[in-house]
Swiss-Prot record:
InterPro entries: DUF5446 (IPR020252). It comes from Bacillus subtilis (strain 168). Pfam families: DUF5446 (PF17522). This is Uncharacterized protein YppD.
């Protein structure tokens, strides 16, 4: 058995390695894109929750501000007026 490897075999191995690296890069890009999409979705979900909480808070503040006794207490506590 000879330890000799011909140039053609080496070029074929390098080509195979290049193909594997290309597939790995494509797989990695796909995974990164999926992760980014998931992160955007999570961020949008969080923003939606915050928006709902802000609306609820705004409603509560408006309700507190409607009655005179609550308005006085509200202004006194939060120094609004």
């Amino acid at each position: 058995m000879s330890g000799y490897v011909c140039k053609t075999d080496i070029l074929r191995m390098l080509s195979d390695i290049e193909d594997e690296l290309t597939r790995a890069e494509q797989s990695l890009n796909h995974s990164v894109n999926a992760l980014e999409a998931e992160m955007r979705e999570t961020e949008n979900d969080r923003l939606s929750v915050l928006e709902e909480e802000i609306i609820d808070l705004h409603i509560c503040i408006n309700e507190l501000y409607q009655s005179p006794e609550h308005r006085y207490a509200f202004e006194k506590v939060y120094r609004i007026g």
